[in-house]
């Protein structure tokens, strides 16, 4: 990890790290110490959170205070979160979704931490957690990113209830969302759109508040998003050439999305999972092509180095504005085939 972070920084790109949120917010100190011992050079320290965590905003404030004390030059961000806009007991709405995002974003920001968050599954249409309803129409909760900057976004466009059958939440209640103090250009207002190509290939379309079909990236930019995250899987196909699903997050698809994001003035976060599919606290499975080298640390370092370097070169050649690179995903207990928090020092080095 130290070697890869050095390579990334030499390319003029900032390094991000993402960890599953520790049970105790002050437990992030252990992570910071391990990274320091290993000599990992990073700019962003991200924590992945679940929306149902009790006291989530106070938890993030405690994280923020701990990072300020132990690693004052690092920017703490929420690297993965999603909130429901509807649920079975009908207590969720676009209003509660927007409030939750706004409050968490606010909790991450202080006079010493630019903060920010990356919203997961933002591109999913009809998802209970996404920003687009079953017809692909942008929901008013998406506008929270712009409102938090003090933007005046028109969300009061006409909607035909017989066409959309949609509870617009914020629009109907005329909720005012104030600008967040201490927000800066460095504050991350990001969304994960790693499945965008797979969804558009399946025929999914996106519409703005006027009901006009628009590219997803334009809708996001117009609502205050400044970063998009792309997860990168090495080879997400089985022996028959069939995708494992999950959005078909290949390098080639990432390049397509990255070029469109750059076109609309957003930066790109490239998230290397160093796996053929999802990597998370429960699994860090080596890519098929690297499994033969599992017991050869030098060869494994070479594999990770070359894949990282070659992929970033492709993004550079394509003109994609890569603002940060995330090394691994939820690497609290390991990465790249190593899955034990007590023995992952070799990964960090």
Describe the function of each predicted region.
Residues 1-40, 49-65, 69, 87-102, ...:
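Active-site cleft segment of glycoside hydrolase catalytic domains centered on the general acid/base Glu
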């Amino acid at each position: 990890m130290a070697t890869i972070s050095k390579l990334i920084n030499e390319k003029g790109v900032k390094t991000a790290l993402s960890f599953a949120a520790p049970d105790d917010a002050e437990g992030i100190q252990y992570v910071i110490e391990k990274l320091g011992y290993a000599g990992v050079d990073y700019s962003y320290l991200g924590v992945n959170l679940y929306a149902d965590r009790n006291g989530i905003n106070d938890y993030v404030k405690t994280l923020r205070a701990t990072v300020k004390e132990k690693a004052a030059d690092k920017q703490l961000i929420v690297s993965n979160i999603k909130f429901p806009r509807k649920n079975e007991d009908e207590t969720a709405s676009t209003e509660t979704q927007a409030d939750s995002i706004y409050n968490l974003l606010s909790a991450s920001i202080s006079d010493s931490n630019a903060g920010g968050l990356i919203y997961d599954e933002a591109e999913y249409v009809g998802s209970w957690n996404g920003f687009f309803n079953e017809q692909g129409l942008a929901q008013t909760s998406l506008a929270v990113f712009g409102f938090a900057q003090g933007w005046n976004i028109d969300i009061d466009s006409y909607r035909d209830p017989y066409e959309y059958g949609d509870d617009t939440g914020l629009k109907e209640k005329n909720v005012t969302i104030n600008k967040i103090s201490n927000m800066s250009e460095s504050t991350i207002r990001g969304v994960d759109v790693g499945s965008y190509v797979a969804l558009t290939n399946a025929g999914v379309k996106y519409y703005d508040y006027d009901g006009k079909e628009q590219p997803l990236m334009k809708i996001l930019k117009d609502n205050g998003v400044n970063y998009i995250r792309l997860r990168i899987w090495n080879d997400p196909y089985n022996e028959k050439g069939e995708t494992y699903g999950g959005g078909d997050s290949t390098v080639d698809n990432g390049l397509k999305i990255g070029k469109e994001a750059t076109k609309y003035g957003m930066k790109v976060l490239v998230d290397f999972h160093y796996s053929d599919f999802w990597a998370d606290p429960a699994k860090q499975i080596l890519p098929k092509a690297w499994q033969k080298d599992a017991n050869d640390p030098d060869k494994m370092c070479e594999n990770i180095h070359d894949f990282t370097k070659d992929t970033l070169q492709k993004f550079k050649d394509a003109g994609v504005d890569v603002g940060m690179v995330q090394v691994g995903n939820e690497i609290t207990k390991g990465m790249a085939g190593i899955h034990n928090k007590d023995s992952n020092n070799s990964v960090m080095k």
